[in-house]
Regions:
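Catalytic-core region of carbohydrate-active enzymes that cleave or remodel glycosidic bonds
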Residues: 1-42, 48, 52-67
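Aromatic- and carboxylate-lined catalytic core of secreted/periplasmic carbohydrate-active enzymes
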Residues: 37-173
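C-terminal beta-sandwich/jelly-roll accessory domains of carbohydrate-active enzymes
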Residues: 111-243
């Protein structure tokens, strides 16, 4: 049993899956991360300050943790993946890269990446779940927050976009609730999607109540001035089976 683990004092996003890979190789069955920062304190990183993990404030690390959780569930106990650099690619679609500060899961149905990646999805036509930070061959996005794109049924997708997170002070220097270390910014960015099941022509509908963006039609795959929030994307000509 691992209780507890975390790469201390770093903001890199490649460590979590690599650590889980090692734990599973060593035969561990229970792997607990420590510790997730409460949203009300994460702006200053005052909670167990050598650790810093929060979806809003450390989006790259949070996506890396999501990938590590998939690794913990799917990697076989006792399986060896060789020595570096061979062990940077392991299991069913996992990859880590120090040079790119990147964790990836690319197994056909799921495509997750903690930072910008040039890796094409294994089979874009079979994707049902996408999560990332930055751009990839199927998503162009310049915002710094995480995003999640999930298939609800054929032609219907749910998009959630987190606000930008900008580091403004050293998160691991002496902490204080009077010192902000990461700033959350609710900006707008264009997002270009190249998801075969969705196509380039689709409707966009805001689902969160405070978002006053009206339903609109996208004709070229590019959602302009996208603000943080939750959206329903529906391929043109698609009749959903569920309301």
């Amino acid at each position: 049993m691992i209780y507890e683990f975390d790469p201390a004092d770093i903001m890199y996003s490649y460590m979590y899956p690599a650590m889980v890979r090692t734990f599973r190789t060593a035969g561990f069955q229970w792997i607990t991360q420590f510790a997730y920062d409460p949203i009300d304190l994460a702006f200053a990183n005052t909670e167990y300050q050598t650790h810093f993990l929060n979806l809003a404030y450390t989006p790259n690390k949070a996506i890396s943790m999501k990938i590590a959780a998939e690794a913990a569930r799917s990697l076989k106990r006792g399986e060896s993946y060789g020595s570096y650099p061979q062990d940077t690619i392991f299991g069913n679609g996992f990859r880590v890269s120090y040079a790119e500060d990147l964790s990836e899961l690319n197994n056909g149905e799921k495509f997750y990446y903690s930072n910008q990646t040039n890796t094409p999805p294994k089979d874009a036509s079979k994707l049902v779940s996408i999560a990332g930070c930055g751009s990839s061959p199927i998503v162009d996005y310049e915002g710094t927050g995480a995003y999640f794109i999930d298939c609800l049924e054929s032609g219907v997708w749910r998009l959630e976009v987190m606000p930008d997170a900008v580091v403004v002070n050293d998160p691991f220097a002496k902490p204080s609730l009077k010192k902000e270390v990461v700033s959350i910014i609710y900006g707008t960015w264009d997002m270009a999607l190249r998801i075969p099941d969705l196509g380039k022509a689709f409707t966009l509908t805001a689902l969160d109540k405070k978002n006053d963006r009206k339903e609109e039609t996208v004709t070229n795959g590019v959602i302009c001035d996208l603000r943080p929030g939750v959206y329903l994307l529906k391929r043109n000509g698609c009749t959903p089976q569920q309301n």
